[in-house]
Amino acid sequence: MTLKIPIQEMVKMVGSLRSHGIDIPESMEINKKEKIYVAVTEKDLESKSSLVWAIQNSGGKEFCIVHVHQPIPGEMFHEQKLRLYRKEKDKAHKNSEKYLQICRQMQVTAEIIYIETDSVEKGILQLISQRGVTKLVMGAAADRHYSMRMRDLKSKKAIYIHREAPATCLIWFTCNGYLICSREARRANNLYLECASSNSLSQSDITRGTESIVKDDDHLIKLAVTEAEASKRKARFEACKREEAEKTAVDALKKAKQWENVYFEELKQRKETEKALRKRNDELEKMRSESETQITESYTVIRKLQEKNNLSMETFRGIREEQEELKIKLREVSKLKGKREEEEASTSNHREPPQYFICPITHDIMEDPHVAADGFTYEGEAISRWFERGHETSPMINKRLPHTSLVPNLALRSAIQEWLQLRELLNRPSACREI
């Protein structure tokens, strides 16, 4: 975009300068109060050295930080463009706040100007023309390109602005905190060329000075007309360029529409894929939950089996202890049996059997004696029926038994069988005669 400057405004500006043409100190005071513009880049504090140099060396107290932002290409999708634009805008605001903080720390006032245009250098030139900028500080190159021998501009933007900027603007080009070069304003040398140095000037000298200033004014007017014509040519060029850009934009919109259709198709496929993936994940989660439940149940069964096994082992140990006790008792019974047999051998056939041969339940001689948990011996079939009827107590002492296991009393059964055989022999007459 090209800014057209009317000739009347240029004449007005020249007339204002002429009113201060004689009083040099007052003019210098005005220059000190002018705003100094500092162009910064989008990168984080990349132009910090230029701003610090301007504050320390320009002598100004009011500064204007110029941030030129290049818009996002039009061929990008609308949503992507909006997100990227917001991101870049937030980044620019944060970067500008850092520059303002530097100004506050160095005790100077400053403001921020945002310019959005396709060309950084053209945006700065537009600002110079619109605001009548007279002092500008910008980078000659990135700080990383600085060297002690650096004397020329490296940045293409700086070279372009050095060549195309209005002649009324004084520009300092810095790099890494050092002044590389400057472009002096042309009017600064013309305004004071014929200024008087004392209060004793003659009328003719004043007249000649005035004529010189008028000539300078004519020169500035011609310069303004030339710049205005150049601006017209540039405007026509920009119009043609804009038409081409509009045509390119239409083509880009068509292409964007095609890509948008492709995008929505891919979005649809992605949603279907995500739906299938969620379904598969739900199935896997269900299988995992069922597996965990089965594992938990298995652990519970194993724990119960372990408890039963421990209980069985305790019962087995108890039975073994009881068997040991029964063996001791059986040995004692065997001794008593031997004595009894000796006594019974000499007794008559009508003698009653020993009391420990009689079952406490049936009151008959036992054929299959078994020892219960209470330590008493019973007929195996009789004590089994006792337990089958639901009894859990001892038939003899009526106390609850710790278990219903039975141990065969082999020694007692042998003694009973021997007693029965002996009694049978004693009952035979021939046997008695033989004895």
Curated annotation (Swiss-Prot):
Keywords tagged on the record: Coiled coil, Transferase, Ubl conjugation pathway
Taxonomic superkingdom: Eukaryota
UniProt-listed Pfam families: U-box
Pathway entry: Protein modification; protein ubiquitination
Alphabetized GO MF terms: ubiquitin-protein transferase activity
InterPro entries in UniProt: Rossmann-like_a/b/a_fold, U-box_ubiquitin_ligases, Ubox_domain, Znf_RING/FYVE/PHD
Group of enzyme by EC: transferase
Occurrences of domain U-box (ranges): 352-426
EC numbers, comma separated: 2.3.2.27
Coiled-coil parts of chain: 227-345
Swiss-Prot/TrEMBL GO biological process terms: protein ubiquitination
Reactions this protein catalyses: S-ubiquitinyl-[E2 ubiquitin-conjugating enzyme]-L-cysteine + [acceptor protein]-L-lysine = [E2 ubiquitin-conjugating enzyme]-L-cysteine + N(6)-ubiquitinyl-[acceptor protein]-L-lysine
Function: Functions as an E3 ubiquitin ligase.
The protein, known as: U-box domain-containing protein 36
